[in-house]
Amino acid sequence: MSHKSAEMYELKKKVEELKSYRGRATELVSLYIPAGYDINKVMQQLREEYGTAQNIKSKSTRKNVLGALERAMQHLKLYKQTPENGLALFVGNVSEQEGVSDIKLWAIVPPEPLNVRLYRCDQTFVTEPLEEMLRVKDAYGLITVEKNEATIGLLRGKRIEVIDELTSNVPGKTRAGGQSARRYERIREQETHEFMKRIGEHANKAFLPLLEKGELRGIIIGGPGPTKEEFVEGDYLHHELRKKVIGVVDISYHGEYGLRELVEKASDILKDHEAVKERQLIQEFFKHLVKDTGMITYGEKEVRKALELGAVDKLLISEGYDKVRVRAKCNNCGWEELKTMSEGEFHVYKKQLTHCPKCGSQNITFEKWDVAEELIKMAEESGADVEIISLDTEEGQQFYKAFGGLGAILRYKIQ
C-alpha cells in the first residue's frame, strides 16, 4: 500500500475526532490555507479577526475565541511558507466542563493539495473539504443480466453498492408447436427487448453522471447465459457507456451476491483494484494461519514485538481498529502505568484512577495516543508495507471480528 493510503487512513481518523467536538458557543476556529497561498496574508487576517473578537459580548466566548486565535497565530509562526499541499488548522476550547478552558490545536497537512481558502468561527469544526478528499472518486459500473432480472451496482473503493434491482415479465419457453409457438416466441422476444431497454435506461441514469465527472473507470457485465452478450451487443447502453465496457463475465448468482461474484470473477480485469488486492491479501493471511507456517502474527502485543524486531513484511490494520495507548503517571512519586484500551475504556479509567496506587497522591497526569498511528510509524521506519483493511468486504469483516483488526505477515519466523 502506498504511503498516501496510510495518510488517508490517518486523515479519516482525525476528521472523525474533529467532528466529535462541539463548542458551547461559536468559538471553534477552522482555517484552510490553500497550496501556494501567502502565509503572511493569513497572519494579517487573523490579527484583524483578533481585533473584531475583542468586541464579543459574552466573556467566556470572547476568552475562548481570543485564546484560539492566539494559538493559531503562534503556530503559524513555525512556517516560513505554506506546506506544499496547503494547511488546515483547527483550534478551540474542547473542554466538556463549563468554565474550564482546554484549547487544543490540530494542524493537518493533507495528502492532496487544498484548493479552498476559508476562515470560520463556529460551534463545530468545518471538515467538509477534508471529507471530500476522503471520498473515493473512481468507480466501476456493475451490471448482472438474466432474462427476467437484473442488478445494477457500483464498485467504489472496496465497497460494492446496489443501485437498482429490476425484474421482468418475460415468459418462459413453451412446448406448444406451430403458429402458437411462433406467436409466443415473438411476444417473448419483444418482452426481452423491452426489459433490456429498461436495464439500459437505469444503467444510463446511474453511470452517465459519473462519466461526466470523470469518475467512471469501466463497466463490467455478467450473467449466467447468453443474455449478457445480447445486452452488450444491442443498442441498450448509451454509446459513451458502451465504450467503457471492459469485461463480460459468466456468473451464477443475481442481486448483491451476483455483484460480489462479478467482482470476484473479474479479478484479472480488476487486478490493480483495491477490493481485489484486499481479498488476495486476507486470503494470504488466512492461508498462513491454516497451514500454521509461523509467518503471521496478530494482536497488539505480538504485532508490536514483531515490528520492534523488524520482522514485519506487511502490517494489516482494520479501519475499525480504535485502540489508544495510555500512560498514567504520578508526578509526586514517579509511579507510572502503560495500557492499551478503547477510547470509551479510557474515559472510565481516567475517572476511576483518582489517586496514585503507590503514594496516594492525586497529582496524576494522563498521556494518550493512537495505537494504529504509532504502529504505522514503526512499520514505515522498518520498511514494512502498511495495508488498511476495510469493513466493506466479507474478508475485511472477518479479519476485524476474528483478529481484532490487527495482524501482520512476517519476513521470517519469530522464535
From Swiss-Prot:
Leader peptide range in chain numbering: none
Family annotation (Gene3D superfamilies): 3.30.1330.30, eRF1 domain 1, eRF1 domain 2
Molecular function GO terms recorded: sequence-specific mRNA binding; translation release factor activity, codon specific
GO cellular component: cytosol; translation release factor complex
SUPFAM superfamilies: L30e-like (SSF55315), N-terminal domain of eukaryotic peptide chain release factor subunit 1, ERF1 (SSF55481), Translational machinery components (SSF53137)
Function, as annotated: Directs the termination of nascent peptide synthesis (translation) in response to the termination codons UAA, UAG and UGA.
Subunit note: Heterodimer of two subunits, one of which binds GTP.
Protein family (similarity comment): Belongs to the eukaryotic release factor 1 family.
Protein name: Peptide chain release factor subunit 1
Organism in which the protein naturally occurs: Thermococcus kodakarensis (strain ATCC BAA-918 / JCM 12380 / KOD1)
